[in-house]
Amino acid sequence: MKRVLIITYYWPPNGGAGVYRWLKLSKLLPGHGWQPVIFTPENPELVADDPGLLKDVRSDIEVVKRPITEPFNLYKRFTGRSTKERVQVGFLNEKKQGGWKEDFALWVRSNFFIPDARVWWVRPSVKFLKDYLKQNPVDAIITTGPPHSMHMIGLGLKRALGVKWIADFRDPWTDIDFYAQLKLTGRADAKHKRLEGEVLREADLVLCVSWHWADDLKKLGAKRVEVITNGYDPDDLPTPPEPVDEGYSLVHIGSLSPSRNAPELWKALKKLCDEDPAFAARFKLRFVGPVDHTIAENVAEAGLGAHLERTGRITHKEAMRHMQGARVLLLLVNDTPNLMGILPGKLFEYVSTGRPVLGVGPVEGDVSRVLDQAPHAVIDRPGLMEQRERIKAMFTAPPSEPDPRWSRAATCRQVVEALDKL
């Protein structure tokens, strides 16, 4: 059996959106003749503690862990945060933050930790893996980012050993939605772009999760790019199935950063409640996961405070129950320059439940390629008020069958084809 080294920052019991792609694929790869070896930090900053994910780690997979030094505790102490507080991505703050300390810490983090706060792990990892791979050779390496420091490890190994290397971009690097907020100096911006270009040009293959982003990566210099979307694992669906809510629940799963806010939607929903008291009596807006304070405030300002339910951060297993029990699932595409290619991993889990999915974002974007059939709908922000009756009809729409194109089994076959062609 061939061997592939997968270098990933996220691995169980660490939860969050970054862990699922290669956790699920590594479970399936041995069935196609590829034995994964996982290289991951021993002591990472936890996004979410979710030990339930360990059930997806195959007992026959070797997991190599090495210590990592990160600056997050210094950052937390300097800004007055608790050392137990999770560091959010995408400028999400559940409570109001402010002051010069926050601004200065962001400036330091953005300009001195390039490409990201895991940069101190690059050199020791390259040194360790060069020795490890001489004793335990592999046929290919896959690095997955963000954090893009994982790609810098792959670049170092490629240059030192000439091993076949796939760089997997779950999110863009310099085209990430919050890049403009990083307060970069010209020198730091140039360094980001130089390192990104080196990775894109020197990797044997670049993978990404959406079609628009593939085009963007080609423009940035990638010599060979393939799209392998995220997917769903039918084994994650609750057993027995979660009953569908009696009320009209509109449920968003996952983090809600400021760029995902949709004031037009909150106003359209309030209008529906005002126009139809029977609908209002049954309507609930449920946020499952961390929510930026500006969004919660915006929902209340729109007059939907009495309809809002929040659960906070929960495990993946609990999140799947909320998905399956929702009347309608809500996907909010970030209102940012790279919005056309945003295709979140949770979208495919949404589809697996058979529940209607309301996508709020560009109709011409990649989300529409997945939500291309009823009972799903994609509506851009300016059109939400005008199409509010269409939204209301979704709460009584029949369920659908999940499309097998988006299963993890299908995406794993694509990964195997890519590995075999290296």
Q: Which role fits each region the language model picked out?
A:
Residues 40-119, 123:
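A conserved catalytic-core segment of Leloir-type glycosyltransferases
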Residues 130, 149-152, 156-160, 173-174, ...:
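Membrane-proximal helix-turn-helix segments that form the acceptor-binding/catalytic region
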Residues 212, 231:
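Carbohydrate-associated surface elements
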Residues 243-260, 266-269, 411:
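Conserved donor-binding/catalytic core segment of Leloir-type glycosyltransferases
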Residues 282-289, 294-320:
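Nucleotide-activated donor-binding/catalytic signature segment of Leloir-type glycosyltransferases, i.e.
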Residues 381-389, 395-421:
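A charged, aromatic-enriched C-terminal amphipathic alpha-helix characteristic of glycosyltransferases
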